Amino acid sequence: MLFHSLSGPEVHGVIDEMDRRAKSEAPAISSAIDRGDTETTMPSISSDRAALCAGCGGKISDRYYLLAVDKQWHMRCLKCCECKLNLESELTCFSKDGSIYCKEDYYRRFSVQRCARCHLGISASEMVMRARDLVYHLNCFTCTTCNKMLTTGDHFGMKDSLVYCRLHFEALLQGEYPAHFNHADVAAAAAAAAAAKSAGLGSAGANPLGLPYYNGVGTVQKGRPRKRKSPGPGADLAAYNAALSCNENDAEHLDRDQPYPSSQKTKRMRTSFKHHQLRTMKSYFAINHNPDAKDLKQLAQKTGLTKRVLQVWFQNARAKFRRNLLRQENTGVDKTSDATLQTGTPSGPASELSNASLSPSSTPTTLTDLTSPTLPTVTSVLTSVPGNLEGHEPHSPSQTTLTNLF
């Protein structure tokens, strides 16, 4: 369209009419703004008013401008304050304390879940590491002392929401944790202990610090315990009562580091049980000596103890039960042998015992003459000669001797 044949006022009138038509026909570009349902629009600017850009502060003389957070912006001035991304073509933008953010930077800085190490936001699509109720970036899940990155399957410990690797957590439990702990020294000590174990210097090399490993893996006996033949119908009940009898006024202690070698300098960690906890565990032990994971979960809810503590208690109770069974078996064998010796069993050779059982009785027999009651009694003594009766010859003289007493 050429405007050279028109005068000045007519040209301005035509331009204004074209602007009004463009304003009515041009679609508004809007986007929802977080926390306020504010729209970011790009209307055409009218000639009767002058708008100031909220970004640069200058006058907006462009045909179109952006409206965000109830402010006007140049299309080039609406940017993220962090990454400087131009938000002209973005669907959404976010405002916080007067600053404009893109979606990624806003969630990174002001999201609900934050990394417990760097305290920065965690994106919903990002892989994380979880420990208890805390969430970490993959690169932030490291040991507090040596900054060793921990991955899935590594052993670690936590104290006061701080993460430690296995070596430094053991040193922390031992109570000899220095201010600047050298990770290389601990690794060298562990290697030396492993070499000593391979050389046959003892089993303590497996754990140079002599401390338990709280890695969630129990040392409970696998499967059901082997069944033993009971010496009597009431032996199981008697052994159970003997194994689990204790004074109700005293608290029973559980040695949690029993499966591991103990050190003289290390104080043994013990767990004290309350009376209702002991009664619950004993009553269940009378029903089942080796509870499974489901039973342990129910017992943990009733007693308030952890599954690890319950596993160790049942393991110790089974060991006591077996020891008492063996003790009762040995006591029964000793009593049986003593009773046999007291009955007066003949101690002669086996041949003499068998011959004596086959030979006539050696008890003296009295014969009375019924024809002469007044005569003295004639006593004959039958004397048994050791030997087999079947071995005597048929013509051998009788071994019975008649003694005339008058």
From Swiss-Prot:
<dbReference type="InterPro" id="IPR001781">
    <property type="entry name" value="Znf_LIM"/>
</dbReference>
<dbReference type="GO" id="GO:0050768">
    <property type="term" value="P:negative regulation of neurogenesis"/>
</dbReference>
<dbReference type="GO" id="GO:0001843">
    <property type="term" value="P:neural tube closure"/>
</dbReference>
<dbReference type="InterPro" id="IPR050453">
    <property type="entry name" value="LIM_Homeobox_TF"/>
</dbReference>
<keyword id="KW-0479">Metal-binding</keyword>
<dbReference type="GO" id="GO:0007399">
    <property type="term" value="P:nervous system development"/>
</dbReference>
<dbReference type="GO" id="GO:0048675">
    <property type="term" value="P:axon extension"/>
</dbReference>
<dbReference type="GO" id="GO:0060041">
    <property type="term" value="P:retina development in camera-type eye"/>
</dbReference>
<dbReference type="GO" id="GO:0045944">
    <property type="term" value="P:positive regulation of transcription by RNA polymerase II"/>
</dbReference>
<comment type="function">
    <text>Acts as a transcriptional activator. Stimulates the promoter of the alpha-glycoprotein gene. Transcriptional regulatory protein involved in the control of cell differentiation in developing lymphoid and neural cell types.</text>
</comment>
<dbReference type="GO" id="GO:0021987">
    <property type="term" value="P:cerebral cortex development"/>
</dbReference>
<keyword id="KW-0440">LIM domain</keyword>
<dbReference type="InterPro" id="IPR001356">
    <property type="entry name" value="HD"/>
</dbReference>
<dbReference type="InterPro" id="IPR017970">
    <property type="entry name" value="Homeobox_CS"/>
</dbReference>
<dbReference type="GO" id="GO:0001942">
    <property type="term" value="P:hair follicle development"/>
</dbReference>
<dbReference type="GO" id="GO:0007411">
    <property type="term" value="P:axon guidance"/>
</dbReference>
<feature type="region of interest" description="Disordered">
    <location>
        <begin position="328"/>
        <end position="375"/>
    </location>
</feature>
<dbReference type="GO" id="GO:0045893">
    <property type="term" value="P:positive regulation of DNA-templated transcription"/>
</dbReference>
<dbReference type="GO" id="GO:0007420">
    <property type="term" value="P:brain development"/>
</dbReference>
<dbReference type="GO" id="GO:0045199">
    <property type="term" value="P:maintenance of epithelial cell apical/basal polarity"/>
</dbReference>
<feature type="DNA-binding region" description="Homeobox">
    <location>
        <begin position="266"/>
        <end position="325"/>
    </location>
</feature>
<dbReference type="GO" id="GO:0022008">
    <property type="term" value="P:neurogenesis"/>
</dbReference>
<protein>
    <recommendedName>
        <fullName>LIM/homeobox protein Lhx2</fullName>
    </recommendedName>
</protein>
<keyword id="KW-0862">Zinc</keyword>
<feature type="region of interest" description="Disordered">
    <location>
        <begin position="387"/>
        <end position="406"/>
    </location>
</feature>
<dbReference type="InterPro" id="IPR009057">
    <property type="entry name" value="Homeodomain-like_sf"/>
</dbReference>
<keyword id="KW-0238">DNA-binding</keyword>
<dbReference type="GO" id="GO:0003682">
    <property type="term" value="F:chromatin binding"/>
</dbReference>
<comment type="subunit">
    <text>Interacts (via LIM domains) with CITED2. Interacts with POU4F2 isoform 1.</text>
</comment>
<dbReference type="GO" id="GO:2000179">
    <property type="term" value="P:positive regulation of neural precursor cell proliferation"/>
</dbReference>
<feature type="compositionally biased region" description="Low complexity">
    <location>
        <begin position="357"/>
        <end position="375"/>
    </location>
</feature>
<keyword id="KW-0010">Activator</keyword>
<feature type="domain" description="LIM zinc-binding 1">
    <location>
        <begin position="53"/>
        <end position="105"/>
    </location>
</feature>
<keyword id="KW-0371">Homeobox</keyword>
<keyword id="KW-0805">Transcription regulation</keyword>
<feature type="compositionally biased region" description="Polar residues">
    <location>
        <begin position="328"/>
        <end position="356"/>
    </location>
</feature>
<keyword id="KW-0539">Nucleus</keyword>
<dbReference type="GO" id="GO:0021772">
    <property type="term" value="P:olfactory bulb development"/>
</dbReference>
<dbReference type="GO" id="GO:0030182">
    <property type="term" value="P:neuron differentiation"/>
</dbReference>
<dbReference type="GO" id="GO:0043565">
    <property type="term" value="F:sequence-specific DNA binding"/>
</dbReference>
<dbReference type="GO" id="GO:0045814">
    <property type="term" value="P:negative regulation of gene expression, epigenetic"/>
</dbReference>
<dbReference type="Pfam" id="PF00046">
    <property type="entry name" value="Homeodomain"/>
</dbReference>
